[in-house]
């Protein structure tokens, strides 16, 4: 799990624009993974970032890089809470919800549809995805949009611009610690 991979997949979260990102990386050695995650958390926690292996498979791991404070705020939205309760979550507490999400990923192997709430997607789009079985959307970008298409398109453009700038800055020698914004 290289810093370059994290920057490519998680720039909007590092910049404070997004609640969280998910990315897959190869994992042949679990001990090495644990050391890498600990090191990354030590480096990024002072900026408000947490990194966890949310799903571990035989030769790969799904990493969740997120901002716990932003997640708490996102999950406190009434519509988000309704979606979580309907999916069997008993609380809106961010840490407990992340543990529950990880269990659901391990148990089913599929992505639980509520996962969008953990990535900063608008609850109306997450609900639309669940209720419409991933069809009937208005637009597709980083997620399928069922609500405010104009706002979503602007957000997608911000995420792309952020990723482009961060990748360029990384290529020019800026460290992940310097690129990560304290929020």
Regions found by a protein language model. Name each.
Residues 37-93:
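A glycine-rich, hydrophobic loop/mini-helix early in the fold
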Residues 58-59, 98-101, 130-133, 140-147:
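Short linear loop/turn motifs
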Residues 142-183:
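Long, compositionally biased
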């Amino acid at each position: 799990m290289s810093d370059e991979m994290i920057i490519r997949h998680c720039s909007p979260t590092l910049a404070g624009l997004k609640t969280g990102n998910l990315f897959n990386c190869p994992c042949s050695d679990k001990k090495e993974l644990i050391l890498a995650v600990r090191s990354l958390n030590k480096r990024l926690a002072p900026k408000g970032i947490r990194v966890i292996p949310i799903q571990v498979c035989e030769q790969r791991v799904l990493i969740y890089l997120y901002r716990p404070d932003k997640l708490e705020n996102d999950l406190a939205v009434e519509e988000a809470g309704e979606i979580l309760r309907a999916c069997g979550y008993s609380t809106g507490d961010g840490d407990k919800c992340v543990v529950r999400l990880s269990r659901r990923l391990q148990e089913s192997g599929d992505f639980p549809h509520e996962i969008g709430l953990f990535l900063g997607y608008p609850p109306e789009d997450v609900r639309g995805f669940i209720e419409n079985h991933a069809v009937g959307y208005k637009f597709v970008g980083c997620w399928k949009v069922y609500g405010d298409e104009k706002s979503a398109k602007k957000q997608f453009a911000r995420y792309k611009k952020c990723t482009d700038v961060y990748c360029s800055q990384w290529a020019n020698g800026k460290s992940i610690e310097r690129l990560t914004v304290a929020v």
